[in-house]
C-alpha cells in the first residue's frame, strides 16, 4: 500500500528489497523470492478473508490505529485541508487482512515479529479461527515469535520518531553509505 500512487517508486523498492535480502545472505537456491502483487491467489484469499472481519474490528487494531496516526491520515479531513492526508485508503486500512493471506497461504506455523506487530498476527489468528469454523480445519493458526533480546526491539527513526520505517522515510538502509 506504500507508494500506490508512484509505480516507479514501487518498482525501485522491489529491486532494493531483493538486493537487501541477498546482501544479508538469503540464498535463492534455498528460499523463494517473489513479488507479492504478482501472486493473484494472495489477493483472492484476502478477498475471502474480508468477509470474516468487520470494519469495527479493523478500527480496534492498535497497529492500524498507530500507523494511521504516524502517516497523518484523517478520516474526516475537509476537502482542501492540506494539513492532513485525505482519508484512509481502503488498501491501507485492510492491510491486516492482506497480511493474513500472506501468512496463511504458505502455511506459516511461526511468524517472527516485533512487539508492535503482535496485534496484526493476533488478527490473523482470529481470521484463521473463523475460516476453519466455516470451512473445516484448513488453515494453520500461526504462533507469534517475539524477540527475547531487548536490543532487537523497535529502533527509533532517524528523525527521532518512535518507529524506524521505510514508509516513513526515517530508516537506515543496508545500501546506505556511512554518511
Please name every model-derived segment:
Residues 65-179:
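Active-site cores that bind ATP or allylic diphosphates and position pyrophosphate for catalysis
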Residues 1-100:
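N-terminal Rossmann-like or analogous alpha/beta NTP/dinucleotide-binding catalytic cores
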